[in-house]
Regions:
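Ligand-binding pockets and gating/stacking loops
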Residues: 1-447
């Protein structure tokens, strides 16, 4: 059983606020902004409007980035990808999502996401911390602060990054998985994609584990002396982190050895499943972390920023991610873990229906679009096989059941048994929370 509140390691008394639906979250963040109309938001009627000017009437207050604000023409660029229906509910998916199509009955597609941020960094920061202003705690840090850890030998919150094979992605800053003004022990531990996933994972040559233990004991004594003199909570955090690092020297080497998985599992995730730093490897590692009680597992995959050559870009990104994303869902389900895991997929915003740059049948670019885009959820307490929300004929604005960033965050916390208005932290004279003064749980997508 999950250890929460008083029974968890480092959790708050009184949490969870109510019975949780899930024990953990795996958040597959697609950095760069996937194009909703090229993957999920099927608009077949637009094929007849290829090259026509997108009506100004549907962009009454549309902000544009500097990459398209100077364009004289905004021609409609319908998707060049084929769509078909899948699953019992006939969910529309584009051709590159052939693996996800097989798991779609476990997935709730939300077509009506929206945000107010139009550039990558503030938009990603809003999704990860609840604010466009840097410095707030990340969602994983809030969860770690509230619920603590289920495994004393691993962090409660782990972050991993990968990059698309076809395109370099936007920079990702450590503050996206940082603790902000929460105590530092709640920040995410980043597993690196090259070399040892964690620096200093192995002792230097000639240094035994017993010697490391004696050295750490001596250092802890000095730190405890300083803590008693200055009453600085950062010192207690430092002691706890040193101890966790010592335990991770034993737990992490076995964790990251994906080659120990059966061939059938490796084949399911694809050829990159044993290559550190690749998305498939990170998906498999996410399942292994989930098995070992890690509370919040954050993957960032870059390369979705399709300002040009969008059809080939989307296809390449799906080749990198579709098989292993679907494999993660299937793997969790086969092990009986999907029922107590929430899997979240999506980026920081969507893309425009109008073309950025020159438009041809084979090539078009898409600018950033905050007004509507797609996320999906799967796992414990989520209604699988449904599509929630709707957009207009051009996939420009939400027309039914809008879901804001803060609503998504409130819903994720709710599934973990956390009331988003009650998980707070006092800093500089006022109480902060992940959802600020906003957010409502999207109960219609929950079972």
């Amino acid at each position: 059983p999950a250890r929460t509140g008083r029974n968890a390691i480092g959790g708050m008394n009184g949490l969870p606020h109510f019975t949780p639906k899930v024990k953990r979250v795996i958040y597959l963040f697609q950095s760069g902004g996937p194009a909703q109309m090229d993957m999920f938001d099927y608009k077949p009627a637009l094929a007849k409007r290829f090259g026509e000017e997108v009506p100004e009437s549907i962009y009454p207050a549309e902000r544009k980035t500097t990459m398209t604000s100077g364009q004289k023409s905004f021609p409609c660029a319908p998707t060049g990808l084929k769509f078909s229906q899948h699953g019992q509910a006939g969910t529309w998916l584009s051709e590159p999502l052939k693996h996800l199509a097989k798991q779609i009955d476990d997935v709730c597609v939300i077509k009506s996401m929206f945000t107010e941020a139009i550039n990558h960094d503030p938009a990603a920061t809003l999704f990860q911390t609840g604010s466009v202003i840097p410095g707030r705690p990340s969602m994983g840090a809030w969860v770690s602060y509230g619920l603590g850890s289920e495994n004393a030998n691993l962090p409660a919150f782990v972050a991993m990054t990968s990059n698309g094979t076809a395109k370099q992605g936007q920079p990702l800053y450590d503050r996206l998985w940082g603790a902000g003004f929460l105590p530092g022990r709640f920040q995410g531990v980043k597993f690196r994609g090259q070399g040892d996933p964690i620096l200093d994972l192995y002792n230097p040559a000639g240094v035994t584990r017993a010697q490391r233990r004696r050295m750490l004991d001596a250092l802890n004594k000095l730190n405890q002396d300083q803590a008693s003199r200055f009453n600085d909570p950062a010192i207690a955090t430092r002691i706890a982190q040193y101890e966790l690092a010592f335990r991770m020297q034993m737990s992490v080497p076995e964790l990251i050895d994906t080659k120990s998985e059966p061939k059938s599992v490796l084949d399911m995730y694809g050829p990159d499943a044993t290559k550190p730093g690749r998305y498939a490897y990170n998906c498999l590692l996410a399942r292994r972390l989930a098995e070992r009680g890690v509370r919040f597992i954050q993957l960032y995959h870059r390369g979705w920023d399709a300002h040009g050559n969008a059809p080939k870009g989307v296809a390449a990104q799906c080749r990198d991610t579709d098989q292993s994303t679907a494999a993660l869902l299937r793997d969790l389900k086969q092990r009986g873990m999907l029922d107590d895991t929430l899997v979240v997929w999506g980026g920081e915003f969507g893309r425009t229906i109008y073309c950025q740059g020159k438009l041809t049948k084979q090539n078009y670019g898409r600018d950033h679009h905050p007004n509507c885009f797609t996320y999906w959820l799967a796992g414990g307490g989520v209604k699988g096989g449904i599509t929630y929300g709707e957009t207009d004929d051009y996939s420009v604005n939400v027309t039914e059941k809008p879901v804001h960033v803060h609503d998504l965050q409130a819903t994720i916390l709710h599934q973990l048994g956390i009331h988003h208005e009650r998980l707070t932290y006092r800093y500089q004279g006022r109480y902060f929370r992940l959802t600020d003064v906003h957010g409502k749980v999207v109960k219609d997508v929950l079972s």
